[in-house]
C-alpha cells in the first residue's frame, strides 16, 4: 500500500506538522512525504528506527518516498522544525519491539509532547 504524508506550516494539530502524524503500515508499504508547504524535509530520528534500518534524510522542499521494510516504529522529524515539534511516527506491523526506545528518546519539549501523542496510537 501507499500512504501520503503532507508537510505543512499549519495543520489540524497546530503549526509545523506532518499530516497525518501517525501512520499504520505493513512491511513493503511506501510512505510518500509531500512538501505541500515550502521549507520542510523529512529525516529519520535515529533513536526511533527498527534494528537494521539505515537513517535517511531528504532535501528541503523535495518529496521523499520511504519504503518500510522492517517491522517496528519509524520516527521522523523535519530538520529545521524539530524544535517546534514537527515529528511523525510510522508503525509497521504489530507490537513494535522498539516502543521503549521511542518513549525514552531525547528530543525538544514540543517534539516530545507530539511524539507521546503519536505513541498513544500504537497498538
UniProtKB/Swiss-Prot annotation:
Matches recorded under InterPro entries: Amicyanin/Pseudoazurin, BlueCu_1, BlueCu_1_BS, Copper_blue_Plastocyanin, Cupredoxin, Pseudoazurin
UniProt GO cellular component terms: periplasmic space
Region (Disordered): 103-123
UniProt keyword terms in alphabetical order: Copper, Electron transport, Metal-binding, Periplasm, Transport
Cofactor(s), names only, from the UniProt record: Cu cation
An example molecular function term from Gene Ontology annotations: electron transfer activity
Source organism superkingdom: Bacteria
Subcellular compartments: Periplasm
Keyword Electron transport annotated: yes
Domain annotation Plastocyanin-like: ranges: 5-93
Cofactor note: Binds 1 copper ion per subunit.
Residues the record lists as binding Cu cation: 40, 78, 81, 86
Entries under Pfam families matching the protein: Copper-bind
Function: This soluble electron transfer copper protein is required for the inactivation of copper-containing nitrite reductase in the presence of oxygen.
NCBIfam families for this protein: pseudoazurin
Protein name in UniProt: Pseudoazurin
Native organism: Paracoccus denitrificans
Lineage: Bacteria, Pseudomonadati, Pseudomonadota, Alphaproteobacteria, Rhodobacterales
Amino acid at each position: 500500500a501507499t500512504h501520503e504524508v503532507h508537510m505543512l506550516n499549519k495543520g489540524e494539530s497546530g503549526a509545523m506538522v506532518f499530516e497525518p502524524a501517525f501512520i499504520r503500515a505493513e512491511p513493503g508499504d511506501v510512505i510518500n512525504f509531500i512538501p505541500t508547504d515550502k521549507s520542510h524535509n523529512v529525516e529519520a530520528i535515529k533513536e526511533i528506527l527498527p534494528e537494521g534500518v539505515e537513517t535517511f534524510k531528504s532535501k528541503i522542499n523535495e518529496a521523499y518516498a520511504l519504503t518500510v521494510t522492517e517491522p517496528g516504529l519509524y520516527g521522523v522529524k523535519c530538520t529545521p522544525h524539530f524544535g517546534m515539534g514537527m515529528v511523525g511516527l510510522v508503525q509497521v506491523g504489530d507490537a513494535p519491539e522498539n516502543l521503549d526506545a521511542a518513549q525514552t528518546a531525547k528530543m525538544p519539549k514540543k517534539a516530545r509532547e507530539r511524539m507521546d501523542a503519536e505513541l498513544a496510537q500504537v497498538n
